[in-house]
Each structure stands twice: as C-alpha cells, then as structure tokens.
C-alpha cells in the first residue's frame, strides 16, 4: 500500500506538471508569439463592388498619431452628455468616436480619471463607430471625410436628440437623427431623399473599427477580447491575436443580430434592425504600420424611386458590460443573446448561476465580498453529505494510524503481506483511504467558474469588501515585505529584486491566511506513511500560498472561508469520534490544560 501511495502521488504531480507544461507550450507560448510577431503581411485591397452590389467601405489610410486632445480638436463636434457617458461625436464622418464612462474609474483611487472607451482617428489606438450607405455606381455618398451640418440641437443628451444633414450636390439628401438614452444606447435613424430623377440603389452599413491594439489587451487567456457578435443564430468570437494574424473569418448571413469589438469589461457593438437581412463580417486590413480591425455589417440593398425617400434605424451600444443592462436591452429591443457579450465561457452552466446568486445576495447585503462568503456556505451545504463521509473516513484513518504504523513496522520486510494486512485493516474498520479526493475534485469546476465570474464581470471590478480590500477582482494589494503597509516602502522599488518581490514573491494577508488554513486542514488529516509523501504534503501549503497569491482577492476569500468551514466540520467529527487533533493541541498549549485520558 505504501508503494502504491507513493506511486500515485508521483503520478499525480507528474501529470499536473505535464499539464502546466502543455498549457505553456500550446496556449501561452503561441499567444505570446502572436503578440510579439511583427506583422509584415499587407492585406490585399478590397475588391471593387460589382454592378448592383454593395459592400462595406474600404478601411481608411491611418494618419500619423497625434495626442487625443489634438485629434478631438481637429474636427467640428457635437457634445455628448448623459448620466453615464460624456464625450462628443464628430461632424466629419458623423462618427461616434469620443466617449468616456463617467461612472467607472481607471483605478480604485478616488481621483482616478474616468475610463476612456472610444477615441478618434488620428490619436493612438483609435476606436470608433460609423454608419452610412454604400452602393455601386452611386456617386457622392457621404464617407468618412464628409462634413455633416448640425441642423437641430446643440448637445446630444437623453431626450435631446440632434439632427445632422448632408447634401451631396447630386440629388441625394441625407438626414441623420441621433438619440441617446440614459445608459449606453445610441439610436441612429438615417433618411435618404432621392431627387436625382431616377431610381437609386444603396445599402445601409455599419462598422465598429479599431486601429491597432494596446499592449495591455489580449494577454489574459481566460478572457475573450476582440471581435464578438451574434450572427446567424450563433455566438461568433475572434480573439485579437487570431484576428490580427489570420483575419476575421467568413461573412455571416443573418437576420438581425449584433456585432462589435469587446474588451474585458467594455463593449462597442452595432445592432441593426432585428428583422432585417444583413451580412456581418470581422475584417482585418492594414494601413502603414498598423492593423485595422473592423466588425461590419451590410444590409440588403434598397431601391429609392425618384422623388421618394427611405429610412433605416441602427442602434449602437457603447459602454460597460453590466449584465442587468444588457439583459434589459435584450428583452426590450429583442436583441438576441445580448448578455453573451459577457464571456461566460465553456462552463456557462455554472458561471451564469454563480453570478446570478452573487447578484441576488448583493442586492440585500450590499457587498459582493459577503455574497462570496454566502456562496461558499451554499456550496459547502450542497457537498455536505459527501464531505461528511469524507471527513468521517479521514477521522477513522487518523484513529487507526497507530495500528497502521505497527503493521508497517511488523511487515517492513514483506511488502505484499504488509499491503494485505493494511487492506484487511481498512475493511475491518470501514476506512476508505481515497475518500478524501472526490469532494475536492467536485469543487474544482465551481472554483474555476467563480474565477471566471470574478475575472469577466464588471460588477466585481473595483468592488470593495472591507479594510484594505478595494477590488475583489485584483490580487491582495498588501505585501509581507513591508509588513503589510506598516513600513512606508514599496518593495517594487528595490534594486535588482524589486520585480520579484512585487511579482512571484508578492504575498499579501489573504494568501498567507489561505496557506495557514490549508496547512491546518492537512494537519487534521492522517500523515502519509511514506516519508516522501510526508515531505511533499508539508511543502504543499507553502507552494499553494505562492500559487494563489496572484489570484483575485474574491477567489482567496472563497477558498480561505471554505477551508475554515472544512476545519469546523472536520473538528466536530473528530471530537465526536474522540480523536486528538491539531486544534485541540493548540488550545491545550495556549491554556495549559492536560490531554484528556483515553
């Protein structure tokens, strides 16, 4: 039995190490290479539209980058002012390209500036939305360089729409009415009047475009960042790395749907009419020195008879991926699966219920930290019957430990006989040495799902808990190297070793508490019979303390509290079976009480 245990332990750690290596080689490594590779391929120019057909306009040539303020000031603008958004839209191209999210800050500091969402072309890393019309052999359609006239309104605000006009001088007059609600949705209604004296065929289009990708995006493998949309009845996603390297993939014929570009917490997405036939596509082209990424759709061609006009309505979402708001738009506007803009992942059947539970509890207690504690209790209750059997088996193992040691000593020269006698002892005492594995394995998907929820949902970003914890989605900000802030010194500033102290060796309060509760939990279990196993198990709390240190505080709260509940359950069972345990030993040392007889 000892040899089997040793072999199983070694196999476990070898497999775990192999999985980590494979993940590094086939996931992390290629992703890093894609980010670091120099993009030298030049995308072929878009093919000219055939007679009677329309396609998305070609990507523009990107001008040399200027400051954001200079890029905003370079074009005439209309101010945008809502309870959640501020910025402006450009009259050149009638683009929505300058937005800040006023209710979200870049850091947890009170004086931190608001999050910047969209930025105009000409600045570094522009990100904007544009809608309009395309058509073959139709001269004078307004493009990105067309300057519109503000015909009505002065500031775009809820209940205060603006109207823009553009006359191409060739018989077509374009009128654009733009509305915005008190959250994140713009409604754009385009009307085209035909006074050319002959029918004109054009098609509506829309594009969300990003030129270049900031270096801090696309590095988290668990989070989808890049192209996203619901087209042809399916969720379509292309990560930035693949998008830049391989292009965006095929065109999708769809009825309605939505598409755009997403980051971890933010989304810019176009929503065409939900009953209209559209062709959506994620496209990559190149301008000098930069990738041009755009998510675009083209609607069905519309023929406007002479003397008539047509109208087309497109909506544009630009804001934080707050699940209740996404669901409200999904229900009120009929936007299919709009809450899938949040990356629920392959374990969506766990991540969604976990988020809904946390959201429900949060409404009543006001903090997601306490909601995580409540979630932990619920998970423990679900696994209670199984865990109870596990801890009873562990307690029995600890109780028969002296007999096991005697058998090992008695038959140390006869491994076969030793194993036979140990198996007989397990059967006689109704002990299962493997009973402790199953509950832990069953909790791993829950742990991963909670990790996903904490990572991708905006509700967890900058969510405080207590004391020093101001962001449940970030690592513990304290560090042992300055005594958790008691010493006014930043370990990251230390010469040569600062990067290590602030990186792999960063240890905060919660990781240390987690490691201590893990050590105490393992101390409550019977010691391994093999010396190698004993050393491995002694090192595991230390190893996992460092492994867990970079994880989100919310995860550490969950796992540490789970360890505490495990200890309480295990302690009660051990007291019931009258088995001595480390907690009683610590209490006796602190109080000076003798060990009870028997």
Curated annotation (Swiss-Prot):
> Does the record's keyword annotation contain Disulfide bond?
no
Gene Ontology CC annotation, any one: plasma membrane
What broad class describes the main subcellular location of this protein? membrane
Compartments reported by the entry: Cell inner membrane
Kindly indicate whether the keyword Transmembrane belongs to this entry: yes
Q: Membrane topology for this entry?
A: Multi-pass membrane protein
The regions listed as transmembrane in this protein's record are 10-30, 364-384, 434-454, 496-516, 539-559
| Example GO molecular function | membrane insertase activity
Q: Give the keywords, sorted.
A: Cell inner membrane, Cell membrane, Chaperone, Membrane, Protein transport, Transmembrane, Transmembrane helix, Transport
Disulphide bond pairs: none
Biological process according to GO: protein insertion into membrane; protein transport
Q: Do you know which Gene3D superfamilies this protein is assigned to?
A: 2.70.98.90
- HAMAP family in the record, alphabetically? YidC_type1
Q: What is the role of this chain? A: Required for the insertion and/or proper folding and/or complex formation of integral membrane proteins into the membrane. Involved in integration of membrane proteins that insert both dependently and independently of the Sec translocase complex, as well as at least some lipoproteins. Aids folding of multispanning membrane proteins.
Record-stated family = Belongs to the OXA1/ALB3/YidC family. Type 1 subfamily.
Q: Which NCBIfam families match?
A: PRK01318.1-4, yidC_nterm, yidC_oxa1_cterm
PANTHER family from the UniProt entry:
CYTOCHROME C OXIDASE ASSEMBLY PROTEIN COX18, MITOCHONDRIAL, OXA1
- What does the subunit comment say? Interacts with the Sec translocase complex via SecD. Specifically interacts with transmembrane segments of nascent integral membrane proteins during membrane integration.
- What protein does this entry describe? Membrane protein insertase YidC
Q: Which organism is it from?
A: Phenylobacterium zucineum (strain HLK1)
- Gene it is expressed from: yidC
């Amino acid at each position: 039995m000892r040899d089997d245990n040793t072999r199983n332990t070694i196999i476990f750690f070898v497999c775990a190490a192999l999985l980590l290596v494979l993940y590094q080689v086939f996931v992390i490594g290629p992703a890093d290479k894609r980010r670091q590779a120099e993009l030298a391929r030049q995308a072929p120019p878009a093919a000219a539209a055939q007679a009677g057909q329309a396609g998305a306009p070609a990507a523009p040539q990107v001008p040399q980058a200027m400051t954001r303020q200079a890029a905003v000031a370079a074009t005439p603008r209309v101010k945008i002012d809502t309870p959640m958004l501020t910025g402006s839209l450009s009259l050149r191209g009638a683009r929505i390209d300058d937005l800040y999210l006023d209710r979200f800050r870049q850091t947890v500091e009170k004086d931190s500036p608001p999050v910047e969402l969209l930025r105009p072309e000409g600045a570094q890393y522009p990100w904007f939305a544009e809608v309009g019309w395309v058509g073959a052999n139709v001269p004078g359609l307004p493009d990105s360089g067309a300057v519109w006239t503000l015909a009505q309104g002065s500031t775009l605000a809820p209940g205060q729409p603006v109207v823009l006009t553009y006359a191409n001088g060739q018989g077509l007059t374009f009128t654009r009415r733009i509305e915005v609600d008190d959250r994140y949705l713009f409604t754009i209604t385009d009307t085209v009047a035909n006074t050319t004296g002959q029918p004109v065929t054009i098609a509506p289009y829309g594009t969300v475009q990003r030129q270049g990708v900031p270096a801090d995006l696309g590095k988290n493998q668990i989070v989808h960042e890049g192209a996203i949309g619901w087209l042809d009845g399916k969720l379509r996603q292309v990560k930035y790395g693949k998008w830049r390297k391989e292009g965006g993939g095929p065109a999708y014929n769809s009825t309605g749907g939505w598409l755009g570009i997403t980051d971890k917490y933010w989304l810019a997405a176009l929503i065409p009419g939900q009953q209209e036939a559209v062709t959506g596509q994620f496209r990559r082209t190149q301008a000098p020195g930069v990738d041009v990424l755009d998510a675009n759709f083209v609607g069905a061609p519309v023929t406007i008879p002479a003397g008539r006009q047509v109208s087309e309505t497109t909506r544009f979402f630009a804001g934080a991926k707050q699940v209740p708001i996404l669901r409200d738009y999904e229900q009120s506007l009929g936007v299919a699966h709009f809450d899938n803009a949040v990356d629920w992942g392959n374990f969506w059947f766990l991540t969604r219920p976990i988020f809904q539970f946390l959201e429900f509890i949060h409404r009543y207690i006001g903090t997601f930290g306490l909601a995580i504690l409540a979630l932990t209790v619920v998970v423990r209750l679900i696994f209670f019957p199984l865990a109870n059997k596990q801890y009873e088996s562990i307690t029995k193992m600890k109780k028969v430990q002296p007999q096991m040691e005697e058998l090992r000593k008695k038959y140390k020269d006869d491994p076969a006989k030793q194993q036979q006698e140990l198996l007989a002892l397990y059967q006689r005492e109704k002990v299962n040495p493997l009973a402790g594995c199953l509950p832990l394995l069953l909790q791993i998907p829950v742990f991963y799902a909670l990790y996903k929820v904490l990572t991708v949902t905006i509700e967890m970003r900058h969510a405080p808990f207590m004391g020093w914890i101001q962001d449940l989605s970030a690592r513990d900000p304290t560090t042992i190297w300055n005594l958790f802030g008691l010493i006014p010194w930043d370990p990251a500033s230390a010469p040569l070793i600062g990067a290590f102290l602030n990186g792999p060796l960063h240890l905060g309060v919660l990781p240390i508490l987690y490691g201590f509760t893990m050590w105490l939990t393992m101390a409550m279990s019977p010691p391994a019979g093999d010396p190698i196993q004993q050393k491995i198990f002694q090192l595991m709390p230390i190893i996992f303390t460092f492994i867990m240190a970079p994880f989100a505080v919310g995860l550490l709260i969950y796992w540490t509290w789970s360890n505490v509940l495990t200890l309480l359950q295990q302690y009660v069972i051990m007291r019931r079976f009258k088995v001595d345990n480390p907690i009683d030993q610590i209490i006796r040392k602190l109080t000076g009480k003798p060990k009870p007889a028997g």
